Amino acid sequence: MWAGLLLRAACVALLLPGAPARGYTGRKPPGHFAAERRRLGPHVCLSGFGSGCCPGWAPSMGGGHCTLPLCSFGCGSGICIAPNVCSCQDGEQGATCPETHGPCGEYGCDLTCNHGGCQEVARVCPVGFSMTETAVGIRCTDIDECVTSSCEGHCVNTEGGFVCECGPGMQLSADRHSCQDTDECLGTPCQQRCKNSIGSYKCSCRTGFHLHGNRHSCVDVNECRRPLERRVCHHSCHNTVGSFLCTCRPGFRLRADRVSCEAFPKAVLAPSAILQPRQHPSKMLLLLPEAGRPALSPGHSPPSGAPGPPAGVRTTRLPSPTPRLPTSSPSAPVWLLSTLLATPVPTASLLGNLRPPSLLQGEVMGTPSSPRGPESPRLAAGPSPCWHLGAMHESRSRWTEPGCSQCWCEDGKVTCEKVRCEAACSHPIPSRDGGCCPSCTGCFHSGVVRAEGDVFSPPNENCTVCVCLAGNVSCISPECPSGPCQTPPQTDCCTCVPVRCYFHGRWYADGAVFSGGGDECTTCVCQNGEVECSFMPCPELACPREEWRLGPGQCCFTCQEPTPSTGCSLDDNGVEFPIGQIWSPGDPCELCICQADGSVSCKRTDCVDSCPHPIRIPGQCCPDCSAGCTYTGRIFYNNETFPSVLDPCLSCICLLGSVACSPVDCPITCTYPFHPDGECCPVCRDCNYEGRKVANGQVFTLDDEPCTRCTCQLGEVSCEKVPCQRACADPALLPGDCCSSCPDSLSPLEEKQGLSPHGNVAFSKAGRSLHGDTEAPVNCSSCPGPPTASPSRPVLHLLQLLLRTNLMKTQTLPTSPAGAHGPHSLALGLTATFPGEPGASPRLSPGPSTPPGAPTLPLASPGAPQPPPVTPERSFSASGAQIVSRWPPLPGTLLTEASALSMMDPSPSKTPITLLGPRVLSPTTSRLSTALAATTHPGPQQPPVGASRGEESTM
């Protein structure tokens, strides 16, 4: 009953109707109509209603240009080649072509009556219809021209004709059958480069740019953000639009490749105009403590009669010091003057400053020199200053001499050397204002000093742009597009060849108008490299059609002399409209009036073709671009996407009467997708792993790793090592196996019973489960719990709960050490949980010990059937120290007051076992136990043969 109620509730829940699905059609409310624009192309005339096709011409279905001639009276078996000009099968041309049938035609005549009488008119059908005999008479039925047409695109049959539609990127030719490629590049859809292809085009970018995700725009490539291993500059990189500039660190300069840097020489002298070597060695004066005792440098002796240096002054050669010479001469002043004059010193007034003020006042300078006599006072030792080129310098002082010499004084000795300049850039600025070394703060390029960061063009190179950065100048030149150009370039840096047209062996400039192929009645125009030809437009005639005459060699009709008329005749059937009658000839865009001279004047509301695939609404004059698109005979709403008919891997979208197609975007959400044959995108079901197809859910091994097992799950591959179970202490790995195995020394009994040499229980390949089923090797750290109680058996679950409340707690005795008991030392105890309850597990708990031969499982009550004996399957270890009993499955009726066995699942392989220790149950509990056993297993079970009470007591 409970199961039936649950099943009914599930069925009702499944059959309950859900909320109605709300589909989104994608249609948007119609917006404003696009503003009409003036029609362009040949055969366009202006009227009071705007611009439109001239009389005798109609817009083509593909491009919308006025290139489709109209023959008002039909051409019959001929073809309309010009307004009201038919080309007949016999080679003649005229306003119409004669029928080949008799006066009444193939299907007889109809009697037509009007104002003056009746006449027989041949039964004919309009163009695009055929006469068909039906049960109710002869009817005109539409002809499916698509069956026999030579349309290169998609043919759509219409009432009385057909429409040949070309795919995206193609346009219908003037013959209304063939499709020609549309050069989309003429509309400049690409920002930089455009390459036309059949039915499509491809945008590309110049070097230094990459294509944007919209496939039209170009984005600057920041070359300076590349990874370290792919960097473009050796040292520093500065990104520019479409390019980059490289600079070098101080001490390096840019090589000719403008990318790598090279080190300057370790020492580069200042410019030659500043640092010129002297032709004579430098001399300097050293002060002496005594006056009148000059010291000369080696190789320089005072000339005869020349005065020596002033008192307390000595001379020395640079850079090595010169020892003081103990010689003197009465002509020291003359010698000093000649020596100073021979030395290249920039100042000419040195003689007035030879002696410092301290010497002129008679002071004694503390310089390291020996006294002249014993009467001389001893001077305190200390650092001696230096007298150099008329100036006194303290010891350990430094100064720069004119000529870029660096000098320093060290204890009375002056040392000078050339200033060494480090060239840290490629275009340094020469030193100014007495400086010695060039500067890298700015650039000196082509004789002009540029400030830091200046962008300039070299002389006579206006198309080259240079930039000054840290004394380095980097220049780039613009890239000029190759091939012809649509418009003249805006700068003088690039030149291109203008677009021309090649037609019948001659070249024509863009926009040129010429006659085509010697036919004076055909006018051709060169537009954007393509030639478009059409018949020469003819002036509108003021006479009715019956008065048109085409003379020999003429391209247009002329009017003959008018004849008096009382109305306007429209066709050969004699239908006339009175003067002043206004009517619509079946076209909602055209209104006609019968004028007094018998001519018909029609005014047409010309429609502007603002889109290639508008929706034509019946009864409406102009097609509608704002409502959606008409494509391949179907109507699509704005922003509606649909697969292309010509290529299933293209996805098209309708946008205000235009259809744009692009490749299908394939989102890949897995690592190993598989690309089925004939599909546009890979799918994440099967896997493509290392070039081979792996079915979903298939488990396979790797060729180079046979011990690795992999699984394909919805495009993802997960691999793991083959798990191995250690069944013995000393495993051995055999060649070709993934897992180790036990050696052959293991006894057959141990291998069969699943016991290791250490006495532990292990299920081997020969082991059996509790129910006798063959099981695979297992090694579980914890055993899973039994299945939970099924809600479809609430009565059984209630009985189990009532029975549990009447049971005692489990009495457990500690297990004796291994080998302390014999074969009968293992007893059963009372478990605390039932199968189906949380925490229940089919385990054996040791109970209180019983004497040998005493029955462990007593009868439930007098007269109750005896429980069948239970015979355990014993397994002996190698040492025989421990006995492990494996119990066969017990029948469900053995639920007595002493023991109970609850099994929720009747299947032998999944039966959890709960053994209860001996206890005297109450009558109510006994009856519940009996009812529970009967409910679980209604059928009686026979006890196994050969079981003894003694074997049962060992439990």
Curated annotation (Swiss-Prot):
Expression induction: By HBxAg.
Keywords: Calcium, Disulfide bond, EGF-like domain, Glycoprotein, Repeat, Secreted, Signal
Transmembrane segments annotated in the record for this chain: none
Tissues of expression: Expressed in liver.
Entry GO CC: cytoplasm; extracellular region
Region annotation (Disordered) ranges: 292-329, 360-380, 812-889, 903-955
Record-level Gene Ontology MF annotations: calcium ion binding
Stretches assigned to the EGF-like domain: 70-98, 142-180, 181-219, 220-262
SUPFAM superfamilies found in the cross-reference section: FnI-like domain (SSF57603), Growth factor receptor domain (SSF57184)
Disulfide bonds: C146-C155, C151-C164, C166-C179, C185-C194, C190-C203, C205-C218, C224-C237, C233-C246, C248-C261
Domain VWFC stretches: 384-441, 442-502, 503-560, 566-626, 627-685, 686-743
GO biological process assignments: cellular response to virus
Location of this chain's protein in the cell: Secreted
Coiled coil: none
Compositionally biased tracts (Pro residues): 300-310
InterPro entries: cEGF (IPR026823), EGF-like_Ca-bd_dom (IPR001881), EGF-like_dom (IPR000742), EGF-type_Asp/Asn_hydroxyl_site (IPR000152), EGF_Ca-bd_CS (IPR018097), Growth_fac_rcpt_cys_sf (IPR009030), vWF_C/EGF_Fibrillin (IPR052080), VWF_dom (IPR001007)
UniProt-annotated glycosylation sites, renumbered to this chain: N462, N472
PROSITE patterns linked: ASX_HYDROXYL, EGF_1, EGF_2, EGF_3, EGF_CA, VWFC_1, VWFC_2
Record's signal peptide: 1-21
Biased composition (Low complexity): 311-329, 921-936
Function as written in the Swiss-Prot or TrEMBL entry: May be a regulatory element in the beta-catenin signaling pathway and a target for chemoprevention of hapatocellular carcinoma.
PANTHER family: VON WILLEBRAND FACTOR C AND EGF DOMAIN-CONTAINING PROTEIN (PTHR47333:SF1)
Protein name, entry field: von Willebrand factor C and EGF domain-containing protein
Organism of this sequence: Homo sapiens
